[in-house]
Curated annotation (Swiss-Prot):
Cell compartments where the protein resides: Membrane
Family, as annotated: Belongs to the SLC26A/SulP transporter (TC 2.A.53) family.
Name of the protein in question: Probable sulfate permease C869.05c
Biological processes annotated in GO: chloride transmembrane transport; sulfate import across plasma membrane; sulfate transmembrane transport
Cysteine pairs bridged by disulfides in the record: none
Species name: Schizosaccharomyces pombe (strain 972 / ATCC 24843)
Bilayer disposition of the protein: Multi-pass membrane protein
Amino acid sequence: MRAWGWVRNKFSSEDDYNDGASNKDYPDRFNEFDNSQNDHNDYTQNNAQFQNAQTTTFGRTISRVKAYYEIPEDDELDELASIPQWFKKNVTSNIFKNFLHYLKSLFPIIEWLPNYNPYWLINDLIAGITVGCVVVPQGMSYAKVATLPSEYGLYSSFVGVAIYCFFATSKDVSIGPVAVMSLITAKVIANVMAKDETYTAPQIATCLALLAGAITCGIGLLRLGFIIEFIPVPAVAGFTTGSALNILSGQVPALMGYKNKVTAKATYMVIIQSLKHLPDTTVDAAFGLVSLFILFFTKYMCQYLGKRYPRWQQAFFLTNTLRSAVVVIVGTAISYAICKHHRSDPPISIIKTVPRGFQHVGVPLITKKLCRDLASELPVSVIVLLLEHISIAKSFGRVNDYRIVPDQELIAMGVTNLIGIFFNAYPATGSFSRSAIKAKAGVKTPIAGIFTAAVVILSLYCLTDAFYYIPNAILSAVIIHAVTDLILPMKQTILFWRLQPLEACIFFISVIVSVFSSIENGIYVSVCLAAALLLLRIAKPHGSFLGKIQAANKYGSDNIANVRDIYVPLEMKEENPNLEIQSPPPGVFIFRLQESFTYPNASRVSTMISRRIKDLTRRGIDNIYVKDIDRPWNVPRQRKKKENSEIEDLRPLLQAIIFDFSAVNNLDTTAVQSLIDIRKELEIYANETVEFHFTNIRSGWIKRTLVAAGFGKPKGHAVDASVCVEVAAPLRDANLSAESSRNLSRIITPIYDDEEGNVSGHIYELDGKNNSDLSMHCQKGSNQVEIEFVEFNSRKYPFFHVDVASAVVDLQHRLLSPQKSDSFGSLKEGGTTTIKKIEN
């Protein structure tokens, strides 16, 4: 109550208490009401008068408090941007229609299937069968990487291609087993079985598919796919390359025939042990090395011949695509000839029994304990699923000129893995190699996945007897050949270094950690380093003080046109010494921030501005502290000048700062507080009011934030009626030619048309040439054309400008040349500009 009394006495007048009832009468009235309880109606009426008076008093007092501290009214802020408007625009506007659109977007097949062209069917059929011939040997090979029986790779292959087409926004992506995810699955199986050996490898892999698929689907449904963008390309390339090296080294023992003798886990140890056991090489190496040579030879020869003989390019492409299937078929035939009489003890390592059909269809075994054991393994699994699929989908969408919907792609991948658990499939994601084959085969729509699924089913029901004799060494050769495409080429590595050395370091560190520690650590390190680099860039933004140069377009040797003023960083002169950069007017500074102005960088930016300005301006008072005892501890003692000293500080006094917000997309509370602190600090330093001007503001919310903090207009004063306002003045119902637009460049004099001397327009000088498009708009019997004013910025906030040039002109006019300010007059809203024709 004491606080309210102080506020009332400071900001209220006695007239505030005379509305409805006199303030001094209230105690008597309350005594009267206490003694006369019978007259209840009179009590109610007088009490209402009392409350009305109190409400009026409170409201007026609050208004005076806001005026005293220059706090804008809520209505004034809502004109710039308001929460109800945003909520109405983004949430409540057509909410039912948006909900239906959301449900429809979950099934993109509804959009493109009715428009399916029958002529596309042959392309989809060829692409589907081609991918099917590749996915069968790859699926069985990747199941080996995941330490699962071969049939589980086929189960994942079938579900991936069959389900994805109903939810896909990419026609090229092929979902199924991939090398990196298979390796992660193997790591997860090993870690969980080390905790509890009661679970089998397929049970663990299926539960992992359930949890990872549910998380991925949830991210897509909630439209949170943008979080993937926080991981840059070098980080993805780093752990992908590390994973490829891990897979490649892990398949060498099986390729050479001494798989059981290499037990190391880290990549570098696997390489060392593989080299130590080279004397233990068996006959399997003949199958593996020959197959590997044929695969690489066929690949490079088909690529070379396809370029050399473009006429036969399609035939070479088909040969190159089917090379893995042909190698597996030929190798299996040779293996059958060798092992058919030695089924119980084959001389080479073969796959042996592969169950026919879908032997494990049903509800999987999922327990709480298994889910708890898998919890720590989920982050890395989800990251790999997300990054591999989205990066592949985006790259093929960019190459083939269509756009994907990342969130819908996550839903498609999540649903595919969720349905796959009923077939005992392990986690699947987009495959780069199979997607590339699918795209080159001329696929037209996602329906090609149905034909790929048919090939997988055919192999499961008709070819399982033949799968018995597939040599493991050949499957290892197929894996090694496939993962070499995941290793980043040297050319791309050098490009990373040339573009961004810091991001290239992330790539190298990720590869090193993956090789010498583990794939999981490599992924975590790359993601953490990418996040640290992002925060570092936000916390240490690049800011520049600007100067002016005159730019023009030069045509030929003599023709120069479109001369204009542009503002560039002052440090550009160091890069180009011949460039003449004109500094802003004395006491005026122009600062451009190249990042959003938020709490991580607020302190650094304010320090940068304060130091630069204090270095280039002088204090308003030489010694603001009369006595040394009043000097703060952090302010150095000023030396007394000698009496005969003629040294004078010629630096200007600080007058204004112009902030170029063209690159600022966000402005938070901490940043605004730093602006307030800078203004306070610099006003103490300059011993006068320092104007803060803002240009190129991109968002109404940024304007609202600045206005709420007291920026946008002169501090402590009402807005002058003669303030300069940027306007656009188009011809009514006409399009000016470029020549006539240039003829409107010089203002001769303002036109005053009211008693207060306000300006409603200006007379422009014309050269009398090429003005036919102006003359046709002259009124009959007159030589004048009226042009309407359209204001760019609000008259309420004269310190908000459309660009830097207009802010500088305004400051030159009002601060540096105050005697000229009357010539500008004021601009009436809805006024007109008059153009006077001057004949030759």
